[in-house]
Each structure stands twice: as structure tokens, then as C-alpha cells.
Amino acid sequence: MLYVPADRPDLAAVLAGKRDLGVCCIAVCLEDAVRPDNRKRAAMALCRTLEQLSEAPRRIFVRPADSDALDWLLEYLPVDKIAGFILPKATVQTIHLWTEKSYGLHTILPILESRDALDVVGRRELAQACAAHPPVIPGARIGANDLFSLLGGLRRPLGRTIYETPVGRVIDGLLEAFCAQGVRLCAPVSDRIGDLVNLQREVVEDIHRGLFAKTAIHPSQVHAIWNSYQPAPVEVEEARLILEPDAPAVFGLNGDMLEPACHGEWARRLLQRNTLHRSAGMIPTVSCG
């Protein structure tokens, strides 16, 4: 998924697939990426653009600024042209509210970037709220920049991954709460656009934690992210052997102990990632589920 501001001058070309951005999903942002005094104008322009769109080669998600903006979009936006809505600064209340407002007809992707995400009880309640609305909510994404701001006005340091900052501990806490409810989490963005080396390091850490999708905020990040998702050949070999119907209960390979009862889900997810990588070439997936 690639985030683009709703007031981007070439938005029509982006949504029509006339810009080679290397992604299969676009998130059109009407929240923080657009000045408050320009959001209504941008929303109206987005409606006109979608109405004139004959076909959309990429899935399109829209990120409204708030619940009032969602109401306006549900009334005027050609919702048959979009895949769903992104819920910024999700709370338990807004998760239930947005699901109700959309009548369960549109996918809702909550962003975990409110104060609730910093609290153990709050994280558990957020996870329970998301789990209450399958398949409307296929997963949730972690919002890094807002969490940095909430932790005393911090910003991601240069030359570090997010796991080398206080937000890393928040992510681990969110994983515990959401995995307990069976809700998949998508990895946070990186606003250090020029630092592709540490972006790739971060994606590896995302994968090690079970975070599958990584959103890009600039086209230059797409290839670096997608290349990092390619499994190593030795991992693919191990995963296939683990999932063999006649695999032993425990066996060794490449100096590792493999146990299908424990490693089966890891193997299934890795082979899914391998299949997506091979079939899509350089086009990343947005799936959280």
C-alpha cells in the first residue's frame, strides 16, 4: 500500500494507473497529509475524480479525517469505486461507530495511533473491538508517527529502526493483545524516506514479529520493502517439508529442529509470502489477513 495525499495534483493519473508506482493498492489520505482548510476541497475533488474513473487497476482506500468526514463521503463518494476506508486514531468507540455507519458493506482498516495503544487495558480493548467485526475489519495498522508524538513529542531517530526506539515496546505490546484475539497487524510506515538501508532492516524485524504488510509513503520505498519480503530458499524448503502430510512429528534439517505442530502456521505464512512475491513480481500486497 502506498499513501498519497488527496490534494496531489496528479491524483487522477495515479488512481487510473497511469503512474508506475509499483503497488497494487493506494491509500488516499484526507487526514494529516492534507491541510485542515483544504480537506473539504480535496474531498470534493476526489469524488469528481472517482466518478470519472472508468476502471481502477489498483485497490483504492480512503482515509477520512474523522467521523463527520466519513458521513460526507458515504453520501457523496462513489463507494463502488473504492475498497474501503482507513480509520485514523482508532478508539474502541470509533471502531464500532465506523462499522455501524458503513453497514458492514465496506472494509474498515483501523490505525492504532491513539493513547489507547499505549495502555495495556486499552490495547486489549482495541483488539477485542476489531475482533468483533470480521470480515469488515481484516486487520489493523500501527501508526508510528502519532505514537512517537504521544510518547513525549518524539520522532524516529536517524539511522535506527523503530524497534530501537520506545515505540518498539508499544508494538510488541500491541502484538500480544491482537494475536490473542486473532487479529493481524500491519507494520508502521517509516518517514525517513532517504534511509533505505534501515528501512530494509526494519522490514526484516517486522517479519520476525509476524507483521506482514508494510505501507510506503514514497514510491522510492516500495522496492526496498518488497525485496525484503522475499523468503530465503532454505526457509521455503523447510516450510514445505513441515507441511508435508507425512512429515515426522519432529525432524532435523540444516542444523535446525523442525516441529510441524509448532511451526505449521509459520510455514503456511512463509509459503503464502513466497507465492505472493513470485506471482506479483515487484508489486507488494496490502493484505492484512
Language-model-detected regions and their locations in the chain:
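Expand to "…catalyze enediolate/carbanion chemistry for C-C bond making/breaking, isomerization
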Residues: 1-289
